Amino acid sequence: MKKTIGFIGLGVMGKSMASHILNDGHPVLVYTRTKEKAESILQKGAIWKDTVKDLSKEADVIITMVGYPSDVEEVYFGSNGIIENAKEGAYLIDMTTSKPSLAKKIAEAAKEKALFALDAPVSGGDIGAQNGTLAIMVGGEKEAFEACMPIFSLMGENIQYQGPAGSGQHTKMCNQIAIAAGMIGVAEAMAYAQKSGLEPENVLKSITTGAAGSWSLSNLAPRMLQGNFEPGFYVKHFIKDMGIALEEAELMGEEMPGLSLAKSLYDKLAAQGEENSGTQSIYKLWVK
């Protein structure tokens, strides 16, 4: 018998992730603050729950994919939240990019209630979510990770166990740090190509397969050139992630000048009204 999965948060990525689980035959209970966002998956057979509490009482596995650490805190620790209402033995998987310290707090609270918690942030954007090819980095108890592997495999391809609670979130910070300065490089390269009189699309054919090649160059540079700034990943969420990484680095006594520069440029972009655009909209700082 298939486990009942509860999915909280049906944004740009969450909706696709939940759909893969539903398509595998699992009963899927859903909750999101704006019910309209759930309409398409409800039409496919997902079951709407009016509150986090109602969902938590019925699900064997509860997956959260919300916006900010404050949202995670509310969903897990509110009086009508997951920790207070999940049934004994349930698996709690937070796939939001959030604070490692919060992941540890959730794991400790879950253990006291005979629940199993994993922090499992993802990378791959809307494309990875739609195709079920996300990279999933997981922290928590190894046995819980292994028990949830069949669920993870419905949403992603590169699924790696990283260590105890908080390790998934720390790994995601490494991911975001690597992307941050890289996105600036991609935008500058495309702006340079255009300014020099080259055909940027043709330039991409040469440089995507060489040493400069990256996911961002292959997937987001074409969107820049097309003027497609729809969010596969929101600017505002990327700024949040970079802020968490800088906070964690400071706690470890580590300086991150490249990350600091990238965040300052994205802050400038957001101040121009682009916080709800995709991260590729950084290109607008160079090309109007």
Curated annotation (Swiss-Prot):
Q: Which PROSITE patterns match?
A: 3_HYDROXYISOBUT_DH
Query: EC?
Result: 1.1.-.-
Sorted alphabetically, the keyword list is: Cell membrane, Membrane, NAD, Oxidoreductase
Write out the residues that bind NAD(+). 6-20, 97, 240
Q: Which GO terms describe its cellular component?
A: membrane raft; plasma membrane
Highest taxon in the source lineage: Bacteria
One Pfam match, by short name? NAD_binding_2
| UniProt enzyme class | oxidoreductase
A single GO BP term for this record reads:
organic acid catabolic process
Molecular functions per Gene Ontology: NAD binding; NADP binding; oxidoreductase activity
Q: What is this protein called?
A: Uncharacterized oxidoreductase YkwC
Organism listed in the record: Bacillus subtilis (strain 168)
Name of the gene: ykwC
